[in-house]
């Protein structure tokens, strides 16, 4: 069994794979203060609650944008699963040419997403990942990573609005019934949802102009389904794209 771990700035997503099948997945808070023992005990408990045997784990693959947690997760893997983890980074076989000025600068999650998306759809595409930061990554029809864009995530945008506009109430991020809000809550929701959809559609349209072809636009991340339901450019949603990419990279680096 493969334990795939996607470490983001806010949340960490874990997946348990048997072959190509995702048996179970979990989302936990990314903690800089949690020790490797605490991570190990937590992950083993998650397995047990799901009816899975932690002893069945024979490999661990990690994508992380939080470098300080590398040692913690390595020790957790060694001590609690008796395996050396694969960290996505320089030297890992991706099967994809990285056409970036400095390939080492590309975040592990962005490479993993690009690999997974091209493996599944086999066409030129843009991957939009709604995380703490929202990332846009372009892949050529030949399967080359071309680069992309990074912008503040939805949660960051919301926090900035409420922090600097003290009279505005905090609202739930959900699609309002109309673009023209009839009350303060609906007006804020309209600005957040449709404003962010405008950002997504606008960046994807400009990228498509530069690419010179009509890319498939794939969304992943916690709010991907909501945005895709309103977006004019997002055509596919894959909640587990990053985990699937980790599984692919594990297979390519055995």
From Swiss-Prot:
A Gene Ontology term for the protein's cellular component: cytoplasm
GO molecular function: ATP binding; metal ion binding; pantothenate kinase activity
UniProt pathway annotation: Cofactor biosynthesis; coenzyme A biosynthesis; CoA from (R)-pantothenate: step 1/5
Catalytic activity: (R)-pantothenate + ATP = (R)-4'-phosphopantothenate + ADP + H(+)
InterPro entries on file: ATPase_NBD, Type_III_PanK
Matching Pfam families: Pan_kinase (PF03309)
Binding site for K(+): 129
Record-linked SUPFAM superfamilies: Actin-like ATPase domain
EC number(s) stated in the UniProt entry for this protein: 2.7.1.33
Sequence positions that bind substrate: 100, 107-110, 184
Domain of life: Bacteria
Keyword Secreted in annotation: no
Cofactor note: A monovalent cation. Ammonium or potassium.
Active site: 109
Binding site for ATP: 6-13, 132
Biological processes per GO annotation: coenzyme A biosynthetic process
Cofactor annotation: NH4(+); K(+)
Subcellular location as annotated: Cytoplasm
Subunit structure, interactors included: Homodimer.
Function, as annotated: Catalyzes the phosphorylation of pantothenate (Pan), the first step in CoA biosynthesis.
Family: Belongs to the type III pantothenate kinase family.
Protein name, entry field: Type III pantothenate kinase
Gene for this chain: coaX
């Amino acid at each position: 069994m493969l334990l795939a771990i996607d470490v983001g700035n806010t949340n960490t997503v874990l997946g348990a794979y048997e072959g190509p099948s995702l048996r179970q997945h979990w989302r936990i808070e990314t903690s800089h203060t949690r020790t490797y023992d605490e991570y190990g005990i937590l992950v083993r408990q998650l397995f047990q609650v799901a009816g899975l045997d932690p002893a069945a784990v024979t490999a661990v693959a990690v994508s992380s944008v939080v470098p300080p947690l590398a040692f913690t997760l390595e020790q957790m893997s060694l001590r609690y699963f008796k395996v050396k983890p694969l960290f996505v980074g320089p030297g890992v076989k991706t099967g994809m040419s990285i056409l970036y000025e400095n390939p080492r600068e590309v975040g592990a999650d962005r490479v993993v997403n690009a690999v997974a998306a091209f493996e599944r759809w086999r066409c030129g595409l843009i991957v939009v990942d709604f995380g703490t930061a929202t990332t846009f990554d372009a892949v050529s029809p030949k399967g080359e990573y071309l680069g992309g864009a990074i912008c503040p995530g939805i949660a960051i945008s919301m926090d900035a609005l409420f922090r600097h506009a003290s009279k505005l109430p905090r609202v739930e991020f959900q699609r309002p019934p109309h673009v023209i809000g009839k009350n303060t809550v609906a007006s804020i929701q309209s600005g957040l949802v449709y404003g962010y959809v405008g950002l997504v559609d606008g960046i994807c349209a400009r990228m498509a102009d530069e690419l010179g072809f009509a890319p498939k636009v794939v969304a992943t991340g916690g709010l991907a389904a909501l945005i895709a339901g309103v977006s004019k450019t997002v055509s596919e949603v894959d909640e587990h794209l990053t985990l699937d990419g980790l599984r692919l990279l594990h297979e390519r680096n055995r």
